From Swiss-Prot:
Protein name: Ribosome maturation factor RimM
Keywords per UniProt: Chaperone, Cytoplasm, Ribosome biogenesis, rRNA processing
A UniProt-annotated Pfam family: RimM
GO biological process, one term: rRNA processing
Domain-related comment: The PRC barrel domain binds ribosomal protein uS19.
Places the protein is found: Cytoplasm
Principal cellular location given in the protein's record: cytoplasm
Keyword hit for Cytoplasm: yes
Protein function: An accessory protein needed during the final step in the assembly of 30S ribosomal subunit, possibly for assembly of the head region. Essential for efficient processing of 16S rRNA. May be needed both before and after RbfA during the maturation of 16S rRNA. It has affinity for free ribosomal 30S subunits but not for 70S ribosomes.
NCBIfam families: 16S_RimM (TIGR02273)
One Gene Ontology term of the molecular function aspect: ribosome binding
Protein family (similarity comment): Belongs to the RimM family.
InterPro entries per the UniProt record, alphabetical: PRC-brl_dom, PRC_barrel-like_sf, RimM, RimM_N, RimM_N_sf, Transl_B-barrel_sf
Taxonomic lineage: Bacteria, Bacillati, Bacillota, Bacilli, Lactobacillales
Amino acid sequence: MTYYNVGKIVNTQGLQGELRVLSVTDFADERFKKKSVLALFDDKDNYIMDVEVASHRKHKNFDIVKFKGLYHINDVEKYKGCSLKIAEENLTDLDDGEFYYHEIIGLDVYEGNTLIGQVKEILQPGANDVWVVKRKGKKDLLLPYIPPVVLDVDVAAGRIEVELMEGLDDED
């Protein structure tokens, strides 16, 4: 079975079994909603068990999550440092123009017929995502995911078409 990372448990929160999660998904409200089923993996990426979300709330930059059956700090403390993942079969369909990170990472980025590089990471610094494009012989390119820059994403073809605005590529 294929799993996709949605967050990392960084600490406990209080005494009632809540966990502080650093989310790595654009869909935190969907992923951590009550009754959602997630998989727990240890720091060596070994599957531990499935967990069902009992409650979720936001606190500062974290998602605070509580799992069904784990209602005390002693039940959850051992999961600090573990990852939360979603099974591929539990992914929901997205609207046109929306993509899961795993669909974007690894795609080739082109400007016209010129290969620029490959998306290696997605950052979330603020208003829009920033795609980190690994290039040969040059430093990584930070590409904002905005309409004037990203013209087309064809996941099936493994290709992203962009138009680099002036100032985006400081190596030119």
